[in-house]
Amino acid sequence: MIIHGNSANMHQIRNEEADFVITSPPYLSDLSYLDWKKPLKKQTEIDRVEKDVVNFALKLKPVFKEIRRILKSGGALVIQTKDLRYGGFIIPLVDLHCDLVRQLGFRLVGRTAWLPKTVRPKLRTKKDAYNISSGFRTLDTEIFLTLTTPEGLKGEKSAKELEKELEKGDDLKVEDIVKPLWITGLGRHGKSNHPDASPIPPVKRFIALFSKKDELVVDPFAGGGTNLWAAKQMNRRFVGYEINRNYVLEAKKLLKIK
């Protein structure tokens, strides 16, 4: 099910009831989002924008406290996040999210970068083809942080089980799961119902890795329900929370629930 409400209070879920939590928190306030969408030449207030990004991230702390409450001992929390590029500079949001959840008792066990197969370098050089220094930038990856409780990961799944569950839509081999960079397609059919919908292949990999059939998967920032849809396709029970009513309606359409 998906619940229209603030995930700082997930009272519908008991203590340590969730087997796995996978989510992507919002990155920007409405004000910073408008700044971020400006043309590059007009992105001139990085100090103010970075301060707002930090303050906005810290406001999500009550949600992460609730995640700590509902996640079973030894369960996994996967957070999709990314560093933000503004005015040619990088705001290190990944480290901010990681530090925030670690302060609440989680322990970091993995960091996976993801790129879509269709990515192309967008290095805008000056007319002098040899002068690329001032226009240097690296490709921007999505980062999936894997964390767990202080007891350490307690999941039990064999390599054979993992490959069997993924074989229908993913050519992943177990030895690839530990690689620091995953490159896949988006895995979507048609237009996404949310501007920041997660890529489906890595989401399915994490669901397969850290949960089993009929176990409970929770997404506290459900958006248009992409993660919940993936969980449903993989025969998991699922609960999502979304504060925006319009996206709740979109998610219900995707999940085919009333």
List where the protein language model places each region.
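Core catalytic lobe of class I
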Residues: 1-250
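Short, conserved SAM-binding/catalytic segment
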Residues: 252-258
